[in-house]
Amino acid sequence: MSARAHALDQIDTALAEVGAIETSLAAARRGQNPGVNRGDLARRFHTIAHAGTGHHAFAPVQELAALAEKVTDGTDQSILHTAGEIEVVQHAADVLSLLLRDMGHQLLGRRGADVTPAAAALRERLEHMLMAGRR
């Protein structure tokens, strides 16, 4: 398998994890679940953070997913249930999806979008949450 094909496969794997996160969030919003399992979210962000290991283009995705993992980290019984918490996780899923899709376009030789502002805003938000949690 070529390096490009491997990277595209890793993008697909990470996008599947983002999709699972979005499905869990949607179920919580519709009231089908009382909240979202923090352990499940953290594991999914962990998988995304380790996608594309060794491929330099994945660095922004890995960094943001690792921050999101820290924000959502909790025991398997710990539930994410406030609207603010759910909104932050949705923001992370949206930006990671945008970054992953943009990487896929670039690997296929298409022009990518400028995703830097979205990534910077998410990084700032996640870092702020981590700092607030330490107080």
Label each region the model flagged:
Residues V36-L41, G54-T72, G84-L98:
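Short, well-ordered alpha-helical segments
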Residues M1-R44, G54, L126-R135:
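Long, amphipathic alpha-helical coiled-coil segments characteristic
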Residues M1-L8, S78-R135:
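Structural secondary-structure packing elements that flank or coincide with functional cores
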Residues I21-N33, G52-H55, V71-H81, L99-R110, ...:
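Secondary-structure edge/capping motif, primarily at the C-terminal ends of alpha-helices
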